[in-house]
Amino acid sequence: MNAKKHTPLSLHGLRLLFPPLATLGILFLTEWIARGSLTGETFTQYIFPHAEAYLLAWAMLFLSWLAVDWLTRFAPLATLLAAVLGCAPAAVNFYTLQLRGEPFLPWDLMQVSEAAGVAAAAGIHIQTSMVVSIVIIVLLVVVSFFLYRGRQKLNWKPRVAGFLASAAATCGLLFGVFLQPAVTQAIGIVPDAWMQDRYYRYYGVITSFLTNLTNLEISKPEGYSEEAVNEILDDTEAAQKYSSAPLYPGSYGATTSADETVKKPTIIYVMDESYWDVSELEQYGFQFDTDVSANLHALQQTSASGRAYSPSFGGGTCDVEFEALTGYSASFLPNGSKPYQQHVTKPMFSLPNYLKLTQGYQTAAVHCFWARYWSRDTAYPNLGFDTFLSLEQMTHVNKVRRHYWTSGLVTDDSMADQIIQQYEKMKTSSDAPVFLHAVTMQNHTNYNKDNYPDDVRVKVTEHPAGLKASTIGALEDFATGIRDADAMLGKLTQYFSQVDEPVILVFWGDHYNPIDSNYDVFTSSGYASDSSADPRLHQTTLLMWSNYTDKPVDLGTIAAYDISPVMMNLYGLEQPLYFQLLNRQLQVADRANTRGTVMNLDGTTTQTPSSLQESWSQKHWLLQYDLMFGKGYALSWMGMESLNSTQTDE
């Protein structure tokens, strides 16, 4: 008799405990899936120090469970939906990190099906964490079925009331906390403009994803109007009439009269994945068994060279590419947003469009990965590319690094062949000058010594004390990619030095990456700090070579958004007024103004721009807004009125 009295009470207690405990378990499964592992270090370094973020994520799962349960009175469904709410984005996040080095972001929802296809084609397989999580979720669903079986039935009024209360609490949490930056920052969730991967590691998948929803809105710059645009461009045009020192006094453009400069050369852009001159580490206690940058060092003696200040670290390739092709700064866009996916959704001003519409160029892009990756298949036409050769169309290419990338990555050597073949095809089909832009993939993160056989891999022969074997192996993997990129550079310059027409080749790296899972390569040697915001880790190697001038020019460091303006200035090409403005900014205000870091004209950096630098930054943003989102008033100044029909002021 007593047993019968205690059983309902115990059952009631279990029913009360199940929702919070089950959703807490689901939260841990979510993080396990997203990270690929869940160790003691995960808790001590990430979860416990940022417990408030995980408490918010748990509350979202718990309230969602309650809302579904009140509505359906079927606990297994509530348990299953809560699990899907947490674990499905976590799985997508895991694969997204593997593919592009960045986590699952809200705007990725626009191409979920495409991402799934890319993941399948890339040879990515289900992980142990996912299999175990599925088993645990099934067990939770089964337990909830038996635990809540025979529960007292309720009529519709209390069920609706319970659902509305739970739904209201869920909405309050979403709109009153997650989508309120002032609130989330007050409780310790700090935006990370540099590295979304780190943001997700600190605050977890659910909290990071939901707080990123605030990054979807573009605000019109203060004072935006046709008069403001005209005033800036009128001043820019007038400034060209004043005699002043050239941007680069020893350059071909500065030392050759305007009547004698080459007018419409072939222009080749190569953005090489994760490229920077790793031989720089030989000044910091490292030694390699081969000269990994022999061609680069030779070409620097007869070319313009320097560094490109990248807006990205550890990922975000498309941000760098976007800046280089347009002169637009990704820093003006919401933190974490991806321009190709969100903003390059209509034809707009860019270097390819300018060359095509005003100079009669034919344009093509070559990328040895899937066309839909970063939405390049839709962004490239809007930037003015007539042709896009992607991995789907490539034949007879070699692939390497299959230990991590099971389907392999196309080699830089094969990419050189693809570039040459595409160039020859364009020259055969038309007499129009050529602009060809290429993006490589061979040296994509992650790095592991097993990606190359021992007889191929570059060896580290000396290094600072204390580095792990895995870190040395990762550095060898990375250095092998740099050696092969250097060989590609040599192959391209050798070929284009022999063609019977003027050619410009611009070669640069998109961003630095962590080598292994940390910054030990940089910190152990004193090369850089362990902060991804360190300016040293944003200055990738940049080379501008041509087959019709051998004047060496020290470019210093320039922003990635200045690559095209500087290229045109360097070789005396006709520049659009927007690029003239950026070159003036580079000459009188700053070398770069990126993600909160300003590089002064003397190469020093600051997080506190001067009033002059602020003024130039405001001009830059106002024109960028006009060309990307506004009425396109500036287009008529540059002979690109045909794009104006696509402009709408948001």
Where do the model's predicted regions map?
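Alpha-helix initiation and N-capping motif
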Residues: 109-112, 202-206, 226, 293, ...
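Short alpha-helical interface patches
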Residues: 100, 109-117, 129-132, 207-218, ...
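Ser/Thr-centered flexible coil motifs
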Residues: 105, 127, 155, 225, ...
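Solvent-exposed soluble domains appended to multi-pass membrane proteins
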Residues: 247-260, 269-272, 276-650
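Transmembrane and membrane-interface helices of multi-pass
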Residues: 2-200
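Intrinsic-disorder-associated interaction segments
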Residues: 7-10, 199-202, 225, 471, ...
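Membrane-interface segments at or immediately adjacent to transmembrane helices
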Residues: 176-269
